Amino acid sequence: MTTVNLAAYRFVSLDSIEQWRPLVAARCNTLGLRGTILLAPEGINLFIAGPREATDAFVDYIRHDPLFEGKFADLPFKESLSDSQPFRRMLVRLKREIITMKKPAIKPELGRAPSVDARTLKAWLDQGHDDAGRPVVMLDTRNAFEVDVGTFDRALDYRIDKFSEFPAVIEANRADLEGKTIVSFCTGGIRCEKAAIHMKDVGIENVYQLEGGILKYFEEVGGAHYHGDCFVFDYRTALNPQLAPTADVTCFACRAVVPADAQQSPLYVPGKCCPACHPGDSGTPGRRAEPGAEPARAV
């Protein structure tokens, strides 16, 4: 049976998440859904999967149930299909932030940073500047191991290990951003939106977020100006610019990304180890995910 995968997020002030949690969990369990829903004072972030009739019912529920006071009435969802259920259980969690930056929570009522859509961004990159003539700098807000799977050509990559490091590296590298148009990007939009809001809040000018992230860019314009694939936080590991799963896998032991060529190594034992963590290896660098870094999101 085909499984429908849904992802969505929104920065919006929420005051009743403690009351919502058991009700949302009960509805998801009744529908037979699995996945993760994060609720925080600054908004919602979710990735769920199930049969078509169940996911359609959930979309109708969250958009129209009076419980949510219309806060998600136009919530956009990203949808993909898979041959199996990628999640083991259904979790609804309360968090301080829907994506952890360890800074004061985003106040959505103060407005979001401007966004740029995929086609406009491609045009800017084609011509080498934005419509005002400023050079365009792509800023990767993802973790280093994700960047290693693929990123935009000549993107700034500060090799962060977790998103909470982002404010410090931006402060240390402000000179890289002066006089330029900055486009922050991530997998599906949530990190680059929060990153853009933070940069705007600390006085950095001409900052945009890539609307819908890398995956929306792939959907709209393909892989132009992008090198490699896009890491995703689910069983698929990585998607190519055609949004098809690649041959990359995630190591069961250390969560490193193991490309197809590394899977031919005698140090790769499915379900046990890979060249990055094999006990007999001297320490081959791996594209390693931080355990529990974040739930699957925005794909």
From Swiss-Prot:
It is an enzyme of class 1 (oxidoreductase). Keywords: Oxidoreductase, tRNA processing. InterPro entries: Rhodanese-like_dom, Rhodanese-like_dom_sf, TrhO, TRHO_N. The keyword Electron transport does not apply. It catalyses: uridine(34) in tRNA + AH2 + O2 = 5-hydroxyuridine(34) in tRNA + A + H2O. One of its GO terms (molecular function) is oxidoreductase activity, acting on paired donors, with incorporation or reduction of molecular oxygen. Residues 132-226 form the Rhodanese domain. The active site is at C186. Its EC number is 1.14.-.-. NCBIfam families: PRK05320.1 (NF003703). Belongs to the TrhO family. PANTHER family: RHODANESE-LIKE DOMAIN-CONTAINING PROTEIN 7-RELATED, THIOSULFATE SULFURTRANSFERASE/RHODANESE-LIKE DOMAIN-CONTAINING PROTEIN 2. This is tRNA uridine(34) hydroxylase. The gene is trhO.
